């Protein structure tokens, strides 16, 4: 903030409100090398001079150091113009000529010394002619005769009067010269066929070739590794390529690429040789086979092997086909037998059930003389519940023991009393209350038999 404030203070001074090199007001750029303020257009020209001549900064957009602020304090637009005026350089002088002058160099040294706090004493003033300096100097015009260095009028190439008859070029013709005040003015863009003979052109070409050959020989004699400004060799367009570095080893090379290329070349040679050998061997073997009749024997052997293979394959397929047919037949027979066995068992059990039911009814009728329909109906229900437990046993009714006779007088509990008294006779009795709510006992044949695993 302090640097910006000091810059605004310097910028607000009357002599700094106008550009140092032109009349543009309110400059926003500065050259630290001289401590001056300038406009945008002039700052671009100062940048073209280089930072060693003029170091340009923006007043508002760039950061400033303390030494740079001190340089701006030591300088000023009016001070610079007054200093350069002592050397004969005005404000309107071209920027390139002005700041490349000796006076500008002295002023830069002065600003640097004052900013660093060193003592400074101005050197003696020597007037400079910027217009006659190196930047604006022009070669003198040719004044005719022998005082001219023979430049051929190239300083005034667009002026036909500047040419003399002695300065003929290859694009001029001798017949197109006209006399004017003792000097001839050639016409432009003319052919040179009438100026030089063929022998002269050939001699000129030979001289040109010898000249360039001499130059190339001189270039070859120069050392390598040095720039041309220090006496080194020129390398570029028109130069012969430098010799490739050769390795001291004869069998290989230090360069990886050369080794790889050499290896691939050798590999290709080996592959080509191997291919030739294989081709030659194949041709020899073929010729020998044909000469000895081996080709016919080989073909016969191949035919025999093929026929045997086909026969074996057909036999194997026939065997497998027969095995599959037998297996399918066996599976079908087993399925049919299982189905017939299942149907026969169901039919046998049904017949035995109805026989037992009939026997039970007859016994009940002979014993009690009544309640036939009730007893028969309940026997059917009981048989249906027990028929699935012994479906695998045939003629179960024929193998059962003789029934036991028992009566029951329990009218209220329907035979459920005493079911847990472990009485063996409970296993052979079946109690069924009558339709008129009277308990009826019968000596029916039992359809179940007790085993260790339960009822069957």
Curated annotation (Swiss-Prot):
GO biological process: vesicle-mediated transport
Notes on activation and inhibition: Activated by binding to phosphatidic acid.
Other notes: Plants overexpressing AGD7 show a relocation of proteins from the Golgi complex to the endoplasmic reticulum.
Protein name as annotated: ADP-ribosylation factor GTPase-activating protein AGD7
Tissue: Expressed in leaves, stems, flower buds and flowers.
Source domain of life: Eukaryota
Organism (species): Arabidopsis thaliana (Mouse-ear cress)
InterPro entries in alphabetical order: ARF_GAP_AGD6/7, ARFGAP/RecO, ArfGAP_dom, ArfGAP_dom_sf
Zinc finger annotations (C4-type) as residue ranges: 19-42
Entry-linked SMART domains: ArfGap
Start-end of Low complexity biased regions: 365-387
Arf-GAP domain sequence ranges: 4-120
Keywords: ER-Golgi transport, Golgi apparatus, GTPase activation, Metal-binding, Phosphoprotein, Transport, Zinc, Zinc-finger
Annotated stretches, region: Disordered: 122-200, 216-257, 337-456
Location(s), subcellular: Golgi apparatus
Keyword Transport among record annotations: yes
